[in-house]
């Protein structure tokens, strides 16, 4: 199967969502391990061409320096991938808060979107990301629900 579009991307957030250090939880899967698993995956000769990336710990500190973000971009590219969509850390319990909340919550929500835009700008300028969106949702219920 040969194609140029759409590019096939793997989402990195399953390595984080529902994971943790509490009793009964599976530990988060490291970014490098997720990239290695993605690089090894193949069905009928088709492999992943890129990743879609959740901008939160432990994979990424959303407040990381440009140099730290470039190092992450280099790791992703070294595995043969480009970065596509970025998932802004908008939920309560990450950086953001509900878009439907009070003024303080809405400010946190917008700050999280701005952080994602900054990361996108660094990845774009560094050459690791040439297309994609910044994914957001209302974050109405947060990560606890």
Give each language-model segment a name.
Residues 138-142:
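Substrate-binding/active-site clefts of carbohydrate-active enzymes
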């Amino acid at each position: 199967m040969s194609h140029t579009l759409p590019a096939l991307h793997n989402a990195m957030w399953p390595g984080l969502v529902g994971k943790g250090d509490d009793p009964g939880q599976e530990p988060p899967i490291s970014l490098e391990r997720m990239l290695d698993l993605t690089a090894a995956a193949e069905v009928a000769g088709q492999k992943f061409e890129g990743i879609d990336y959740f901008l939160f710990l432990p994979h990424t500190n959303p407040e990381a320096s440009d140099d730290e973000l470039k190092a992450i971009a280099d790791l992703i590219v070294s595995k043969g991938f480009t970065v596509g969509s970025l998932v802004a850390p908008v939920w309560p319990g990450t950086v953001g808060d509900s878009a439907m909340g009070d003024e303080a919550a809405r400010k946190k929500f917008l700050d999280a979107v701005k952080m994602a835009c900054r990361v996108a700008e660094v990845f774009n300028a560094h050459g690791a990301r040439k297309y994609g969106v910044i994914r957001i949702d209302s974050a109405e219920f947060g990560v606890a629900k």
